Amino acid sequence: MRLSQFWLVTKKESPAEAEVISHQLMLRAGMIRQTAVGIYSWLPLGLRVLNKVSAIIREEMDRAGALEVVMPAAQPAELWQESGRWHAYGPELQRFIDRHQRDYCIGPTHEEVVTDLVRRDLSSYKQLPVNLYQIQTKFRDEIRPRFGVMRGREFVMKDGYSFDLDVAGMKNSYQKMYDAYCRIFDRLGLNYRPVIADNGAIGGTGSHEFHVLAETGEDSIAFSNASDYAANIEKAEALPPTKPRPAPSLEMEKRATPDCKTIAQLVERYQLPIEKTLKTLLVEGADGGIVALVLRGDHELNTIKAEQLPEVAKPFSLAEESKVRGLMGAGFGSLGPVGLKALSVPVIVDHSAAICADFVVGANEDGYHYFNVNWERDAEITRTADIRNVVEGDPSPDGQGTLLIRRGIEVGHVFQLGEKYSKAMNLTVPLEDGTLCTPLMGCYGIGVTRVIAAAIEQNHDENGIIWSKELAPFSVAILPINADKSEAVRDAAEALYQKFLQAGVDVVLDDRNRRAGVMFADIDLIGIPARIVISDKTLATGSVEFKRRNEQETFHISLEEIVAQFCAEEKH
């Protein structure tokens, strides 16, 4: 490709609206342009990268036995009503009415459509298993689109769906996709972690998320420093402490704490170790009453875990303040477990809080706290449970090492759906003995556009993007210095360009006749992995100047040997 014939529209300054580095660099490099809030056009440079990612995905899907299809973006409401998601999905689902007054949506995902597609032609168990996938533009009306294509409203996604006759088959299909996703992200050169995850709105029985580690990630993930264990912080188990609870050493006393409505204020005012404070949260109970959840002041409630408790109402919600005040006689900042047994309020205590002694809690009276409280003597535990988020340094749930907590960008998610959609949509197939079987499904997604942003978040410097060779829009750039003034430079650059083309290399020639500084800045900004500089000075020694984007050192290599040497290195 000749840059004089390419739509390269770079910018020196970062646009004010770009919050994260990937958004800044994608705009500056001329990869994307915003069309509307959360909606972007992909320019030629960006599309080349998008196509590189899609090609790797297709290769690994084909290798794993998945079959590519294309399903419609517009989906009839009837299918979503069959699954029960038409009303459950919420305002993120973009709905519209056609000229015949029929309801449709723009698909954010395709479980319903693919289930309908398969049930139309599935007549024998011999047709299964089957795994269908597509790479398609989706739309989700995010309430707060941000970070460019990382959380846009319109995005490109690879979504796949498997159908199997039994649990063993479903798990086998799931493992194939899990392995394929690992190969994809390995090939893309990403520093990522597959983590145990919650199924969320998709439903099903088991799932893993694939997270690219980056400080700008919106999710927290926990992983062992000594094993492959990794989990979304929502799913990571906090193991019960092994040490016993200390014996009480002080008598409980009630103190006025008029200026202490938060744990932080209490700790600062009385110079307390924060782990000596307990917080009590009152939540809606499954029976219509109230349930108390108690955890250490330095720990955060995990609402996903709390919602799984049989005593707690689904969906999880804090009790209304008026209800709390009517029962307890105090507001949220002054609650504690003392006296709750007499009010028939179940007290579920996190394992870490259950081994505390001589701790501080709210006194169920505004402006007062109890100090030196102890379990059994002063307050009763209904039962203990894991209801908190893990923290860095906690023991790994697999017994190997301790946990690290890092931010992650979710770029992939695989689910074992089971019968969730096939049963709801009456998908059945006759078995050999004539009995009807409801196939078990899996679904598998990769955010293709998000992968690109995540790769930039991990691979950049002050000069721009640093692409891996698998993702780069071009493999090597030829930069002829003062080509408009030197016929020798111009001819040598053209000859070298043709040799690279003949060798099948994705090469770009900067023939725009710009100043050397402009050429260097643009090539660094757009992240080309290697650059070759040709000048009268290098030609005088029969060489070119060669530099890798991710290295500081430059090398002088023979003009006659550079193509062969470059191609040999690219194979390794």
Curated annotation (Swiss-Prot):
Disulfide bonds listed in the record: none
Subcellular location: Cytoplasm
Annotated catalysed reactions: tRNA(Pro) + L-proline + ATP = L-prolyl-tRNA(Pro) + AMP + diphosphate
GO cellular component: cytosol
SUPFAM superfamilies attached to this UniProt entry: Class II aaRS ABD-related, Class II aaRS and biotin synthetases, YbaK/ProRS associated domain
InterPro entries for the chain: aa-tRNA-synt_IIb, aa-tRNA-synth_II, aa-tRNA-synth_II/BPL/LPL, Anticodon-bd, Anticodon-bd_dom_sf, Pro-tRNA-ligase_IIa, Pro-tRNA-synth_IIa_bac-type, Pro-tRNA-Synthase_IIa_type1
EC number(s) recorded for this UniProt protein: 6.1.1.15
UniProt keyword list: Aminoacyl-tRNA synthetase, ATP-binding, Cytoplasm, Ligase, Nucleotide-binding, Protein biosynthesis
Gene3D superfamilies in UniProt: Anticodon-binding domain, Bira Bifunctional Protein, Domain 2
Enzyme class, spelled out: ligase
Lineage: superkingdom: Bacteria
GO MF assignments: aminoacyl-tRNA deacylase activity; ATP binding; proline-tRNA ligase activity
Main function: Catalyzes the attachment of proline to tRNA(Pro) in a two-step reaction: proline is first activated by ATP to form Pro-AMP and then transferred to the acceptor end of tRNA(Pro). As ProRS can inadvertently accommodate and process non-cognate amino acids such as alanine and cysteine, to avoid such errors it has two additional distinct editing activities against alanine. One activity is designated as 'pretransfer' editing and involves the tRNA(Pro)-independent hydrolysis of activated Ala-AMP.
Domains as described in the record: Consists of three domains: the N-terminal catalytic domain, the editing domain and the C-terminal anticodon-binding domain.
HAMAP family for the chain: Pro_tRNA_synth_type1
The protein, known as: Proline--tRNA ligase
Provenance organism: Dichelobacter nodosus (strain VCS1703A)
Native organism taxonomy: Bacteria, Pseudomonadati, Pseudomonadota, Gammaproteobacteria, Cardiobacteriales
